[in-house]
């Protein structure tokens, strides 16, 4: 596949091994990954034995359909790309995580998909051990079968030409299929000469009679050579399952070609003797950390609500009816928003964007739009440029100009969280009601967040 071959050439030398994957349509729909020309795919590895991560590498991703790029009908189709893998002293740690980040420069799109090293390495090893030759529709031609004449010509075109067949009709037809160099053309008639030469005469212009005669030398022809990218068909592919989402995908193994030969070497795995924390804690370390911070934030919201006598203030100036039904609806939205936040463990959240923002963007705010009662998917990590969320009336008027905030205030079944660079956050509910909380993060937490998610 083109994407795998390009990554093998340009990304392969910058990592220890490449895992070539194909993400099918079901995987793309599950993770809401769009297929647009402007999308940028970048990957890096989060190490389980240290809080840091590897350098970020941009990889090539391309959509592949059955029958395209010389693919077989039985080949996997979807989004083809590669995941760089990094080893420790020659061994791969099974609990390291390869992170695929999908972003689009012209929009706020920022998605991350995680792949566990253990799943990738096991699938690569299984594909290597059970490699099979690609066949058409899964059926291999019987031994001794007579090939089609055109297939025989193609085989001869790829083979080294036999001098005995240089003047034969079969070689003439073969030469038409092969892009040969000048002078590598078989002629049917032995008396024909190269074009541009007249028998007995030279086409060189006569030397001028004026002045001393000078010998004219033709400059040597310029030869340009390049190594084209060979888009081979995978020798085999294995099904794999994403540990974090349960969505299936494919891992491709190639038989030959450059560094792809390393796919056939043993893949060393280094399991810790007594991992601390246990393996589930290493695999879901990011989820546990983010979920802990989300629960702490919800605790600050509930504490602020108790301090205010279990009341909510209307921060955004909008007109709404004042009756018991509206009060019950706002209360229900507040309880549902707290439940959603406790279960939201995503590194694309606004508070992580705020914690990892560069110093030049400290005057911006970030927002998460939450779909309550599973009414809509969440939209996380939206940047509100030029907005200051200090809590004053003027700040709320500026915030109200944001389209997503307007939909939240005037709608239902939705809430939003606005986070400042200082990690102060406001939960905004329909009707303009808002309550202030805070994400607790120590200096060590900020170093961990910036090194792992920045």
Curated annotation (Swiss-Prot):
It is found in: Virion; Host nucleus. The keyword Translocase does not apply. Pfam families: Herpes_UL17. Residues 197-227 are annotated as: Disordered. It comes from the Viruses. GO terms for biological process: chromosome organization. The keyword Acetylation does not apply. GO terms for cellular component: host cell nucleus; viral capsid. Its main location: virion. InterPro entries: UL17-like. Keywords: Capsid protein, Host nucleus, Late protein, Viral genome packaging, Viral release from host cell, Virion. Capsid vertex-specific component that plays a role during viral DNA encapsidation, assuring correct genome cleavage and presumably stabilizing capsids that contain full-length viral genomes. Interacts (via C-terminus) with capsid vertex component 2/CVC2. Belongs to the herpesviridae CVC1 protein family. HAMAP family: HSV_CVC1. This is Capsid vertex component 1. The lineage of its organism: Viruses, Duplodnaviria, Heunggongvirae, Peploviricota, Herviviricetes. The gene is CVC1.
